[in-house]
């Protein structure tokens, strides 16, 4: 992960640190999708993060997890999963007064994807758990490949989930929104279960997610998604606030020689408006 991620983004991060925060930090979100959780594995990740801590968005570890401490925002934000094994290393073993380098997801009840938001994620954010990771099935329970038309009712469901997340001080992420041909699926090794079947179908979901304030959108078609999100942003020369808070998710297919260290990494570039980000850092 050092060579694959940190050293590759070094020029971006060092330039950002030199120029200072202009309201667009964090520039990069590193989402750790861990496929094994041996204590030694997690400890090695923590030790690596500590070496780059000046780059990382952090919060102070206090005596109570319930209180969300203000984030010290830096160019990189690191997110991880919801497991207790990860929390044990990334939060429990951090000394009081120390820094949290990585933030976990709240636990999601996946038994009924159509359940009300409070049934899916009953726990609010805390000092460690700051985001909510969702399969798209919580919006369209039949799944991407059988989703059918995008409707007013589906958009209302998506809006309900986003409002619930933000009302509980959580960033919200959905995975994975693709609209590829069969040939593209075959050539790239993408999962058919994540595929809406056409550009038109997935674009409607991308646009709705951006409009409603979804914080992270995961897609294998990151270049097209990025272009769409960029087109939805106001001209930099204007003074109008950015109404969108979606982030571009770039899925890395493999980690090469360190694949046994971290099974998959997702790098996500935020385009959130500053005011919403600041509210989240304060837990307000």
Report each predicted region and the residues it spans.
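Catalytic cores of phosphodiester-bond hydrolases, prominently lipid phosphodiesterases
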Residues: 1-283
């Amino acid at each position: 992960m050092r060579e694959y991620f940190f050293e590759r983004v070094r020029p971006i991060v060092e330039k950002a640190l030199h120029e200072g925060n202009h309201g667009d930090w964090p520039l990069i979100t590193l989402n750790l999708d861990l496929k094994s959780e041996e204590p030694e594995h997690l400890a090695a990740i923590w030790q690596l993060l500590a070496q780059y801590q000046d780059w990382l968005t952090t919060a102070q570890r206090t005596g109570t997890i319930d209180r969300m401490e203000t984030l010290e925002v830096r160019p990189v934000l690191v997110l991880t999963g919801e497991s207790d094994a990860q929390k044990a290393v990334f939060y429990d073993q951090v000394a009081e007064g120390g820094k949290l380098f990585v933030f976990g997801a709240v636990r999601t009840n996946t038994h009924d994807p159509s359940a009300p938001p409070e049934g899916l994620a009953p726990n609010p954010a805390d000092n460690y758990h700051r985001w909510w990771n969702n399969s798209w099935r919580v919006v369209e329970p039949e799944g991407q490949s059988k989703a059918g038309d995008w409707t007013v009712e589906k958009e209302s469901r998506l809006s309900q989930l986003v409002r619930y997340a933000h009302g509980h001080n959580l960033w919200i992420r959905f995975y994975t929104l693709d609209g590829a041909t069969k040939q593209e699926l075959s050539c790239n090794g993408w999962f058919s279960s994540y595929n809406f079947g056409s550009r038109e179908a997935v674009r409607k979901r991308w646009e709705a997610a951006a409009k409603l304030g979804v914080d992270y959108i995961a897609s294998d078609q990151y270049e097209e998604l990025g272009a769409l999100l960029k087109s939805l942003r106001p001209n930099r020369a204007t003074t109008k606030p950015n109404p969108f808070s979606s982030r571009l998710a770039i899925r890395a297919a493999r980690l090469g020689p360190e694949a046994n260290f971290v099974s998959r990494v997702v790098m996500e570039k935020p385009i959130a408006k500053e005011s919403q980000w600041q509210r989240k850092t304060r837990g307000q």
